[in-house]
Amino acid sequence: QQHSGLILFSSGSTGAPKAMIHNLDNLVDSYKGKRGKNIVFLIFLMFDHIGGLNSLLNCLSMGVTMVFPEHREPEHVAELIEKYKVNILPASPTFLNLVLISEANLRYNMSSLRMITYGTEPMPDSLLLKLKTFFPRVKFLQTFGTSETGISQTTSKSSDSTFLKIDDPNTEIKIVRGELWIRSKTQVMGYLNSSMERFTEDGWFKTGDLVEEASDGYIKI
């Protein structure tokens, strides 16, 4: 059970990229027990990213139909959504903004969409409100995860809110001096040729993300 099976590289946004060693058994185990669903899912995120692997493993565990774009231009993605009646689109706020700017959503029928999930970067409140205007029947869900700890289950306060709860049975969270700390069953075994300085001795990962807490338990990252 304690064998490495996956190496992901960090983005290197705060220094040299780090090679992160994951236990693949633990990652795969977190997707067990999911029910089959008759949905069409567009695979948007790349597989060198924890979010892309999350999309792939989720789809395989539920036996859903996957659509793979040749590239990620808004026009092409919108065309695929119309052609294959895509139900779920995972994307970044930047890409969703490009869809609106390009008006690809006006040239193609995207009414099959039931859910748009977003993450990897902050979602501006103003953009989320615009998206809800153009996609009023779509549920918007904010996702959260890190390459070090994996993707956690989340619940958005509402489709037009950027507040969320991390309510994953495999994930613990706490807020220390305004910073989000995470401890999960799917976190890395270690780094190649690099220290674990962002982890505490008892396994908490210091994400570096500052959060705003609401009185009802939701947080804004």
Where are the regions that the model predicts?
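Gly/Ser/Thr-rich phosphate-binding loop
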Residues: I88-P90, E103-S161
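Conserved AMP-binding/adenylation subdomain of ANL enzymes
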Residues: V28-V40, D48-I88
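Alpha-helix capping/helix-boundary segments
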Residues: E73, T94-L96, M123, Q187
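Conserved ATP-binding/catalytic segment of the ANL
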Residues: W181-I221
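Conserved G/P- and acidic residue-centered "switch" motifs that form tight phosphate/ATP-binding loops
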Residues: S13, G63, T120, G145, ...
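Conserved AMP-binding A3 loop
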Residues: S4-K32
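Short Gly/Pro-enriched turn/cap motifs at secondary-structure boundaries
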Residues: S161-D167, E201-G203
